[in-house]
């Protein structure tokens, strides 16, 4: 199962960073071309479900996920259950100096079988760039976050 991990340091305390990270409806303010919303529950407990729509205009991808671990303010794990994005995702927040480090890991079950595995080396750098760029935007946003 291919994985993808990116991280960023944030000049804000763990509790503030966590609150910003799991403010699902506002993720579009920092995540590239994405809107997120809870669909079952509030998105703050194991078993709650979320939908993320990533795209531009009428072209996009729907990512459905279920929260499988909720350990505030340090860790949220989800299971992606959509048609394209499948597998575990992990958001972790750790104290670092006077601030925090956010680590985002995706353990992907690639679609299209062998074709997906063959295409991963081409897709991976683009996916990594998008996640890293989103996390860089998140860091600046989270430092100003007030809920």
List PLM regions with ranges.
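Short hydrophobic/aromatic-rich motifs at helix boundaries and adjacent loops
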Residues: 8, 36, 61-63, 107-111
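Glycine-rich portal/gate segments that line the openings of hydrophobic small-molecule binding cavities
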Residues: 28, 38-85, 96-101, 133-147
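Residue-level detector of alpha-helix boundaries and kinks
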Residues: 2, 12, 52, 78, ...
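Conserved short-loop catalytic and cofactor-binding motifs
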Residues: 5, 37-38, 55, 119-122, ...
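Hydrophobic ligand-binding cavity/cleft-lining segments
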Residues: 1-45, 137-140, 147
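Beta-strand/loop substructures that line and gate deep hydrophobic ligand-binding cavities in soluble
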Residues: 79-133
């Amino acid at each position: 199962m291919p994985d993808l991990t990116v991280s960023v340091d944030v000049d804000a305390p763990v509790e503030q960073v966590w609150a910003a990270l799991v403010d699902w409806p506002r993720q579009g303010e920092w995540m590239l071309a994405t809107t997120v919303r809870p669909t079952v529950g509030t998105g703050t407990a194991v078993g709650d479900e979320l939908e993320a729509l990533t795209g531009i205009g009428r072209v996009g991808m729907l990512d459905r996920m279920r929260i499988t671990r909720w350990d505030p303010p340090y860790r949220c794990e989800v299971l992606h259950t959509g048609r394209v994005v499948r597998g575990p995702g992990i958001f972790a927040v750790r104290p670092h100096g006077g601030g925090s480090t956010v680590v985002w890991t995706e353990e992907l079950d690639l679609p299209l079988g062998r074709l997906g595995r063959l295409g991963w080396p081409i897709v991976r750098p683009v996916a990594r760039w998008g996640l890293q760029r989103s996390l860089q935007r998140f860091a600046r946003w989270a430092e100003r976050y007030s809920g």
